[in-house]
Amino acid sequence: MAYNFLCETTTEPNWGKLNKLLKKYNQLESFPFLEATDEKFGLAISVPMKNVGGSAYKQFIHVNKLLTKNFKFTVYDMYYGKEVDKEHIKVIRREIT
């Protein structure tokens, strides 16, 4: 089991650079994918249940900022089906800490 996030962008990111940056977040797992039907580029982020806690939450906050600010991704919480924003981040904190 894991807590999952879907990240989407319409601009193809530099996957090599992104992968290098994400490697240091060892509490999270990620993998890229292409949504061929609507020409969006996607990234899945997971917090495995074995990693749930304050450290994983802090890492997710850093990754969320990295993805939204530097790579122009929109991040969605797959459990609730909502975009991760300033309000919803409080819900995520309760779920993964």
Give the ranges of each region predicted by the language model.
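Acidic (Asp/Glu-rich) sequence patches and key acidic residues
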Residues: 1-97
